Amino acid sequence: VDITRILTASTDQLDEQELTARALLMLAGAEGDYLTNAEYERRKRELENVANAITTDVLKYWSQNPELRVMPDITQKTMTDNRGQHSVLDELKIRIWDNRHQLSLPFDEHSTGFRWFFSFLAAFSEFEYSDDPVVLLLDEPALGLHGRAQADFLRFIQERLAPNHQVLYTTHSPFMVQPGKLERVRVVEDKSQDLGCVITSDFATTDPDTLFPLQGALGYDLAQHLFISPH
């Protein structure tokens, strides 16, 4: 993505990829003048600061592989317009270094789940320090994530968003239900044509299909205690 464009354009002028890149730079507290500075050492130091900040703030929540590290870089790309005029753009590229396998891959070549997780944390981290309380409504988030990554996603919400904001989400996944906090859960059941959908915290009156995610969450929690508990 064009670094100058994402630093200067308004939000409605940027696509999803550009918005994610800008959110990452804002999260890292990046200085635009340093990122585009002609002096190599100054530009390199700012890129390393960005890498450290993003790795610390985002990738610490990806427990499936704690040995990942963000590697942002800025390259120059020559563009030619319709009149044959040439211009040089500073292009931001993001790679992910995997210390476990001793290689790096472009961000776009990682799994859909990883890209979604990374992008969500980058975009929603801006709410952490917002002075205005907001209500975040998420419809079936983290669908493409492994069960462990869904637990990481909940940990991010619990630690970074929930202390200052209200977060509501819908889910059918047992891994998105916290067994120790069932008082927060509401189930939605389609009762009949006359009643329509009913939202309740009374699990005893709910049909088995609706209760399945809760049963799965409690069963997984019980299995974890049986296999992992020191007792």
Question: What are these model-derived regions, one by one?
Answer:
Residues 231:
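Conserved strand-helix element at the start of the C-terminal RecA-like helicase core
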Residues 46, 50-69, 73, 78, ...:
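Switch/communication elements of ASCE P-loop NTPase nucleotide-binding domains
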Residues 1-65, 87-89, 95-97:
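Coupling/switch segment of ABC-type P-loop NTPase heads
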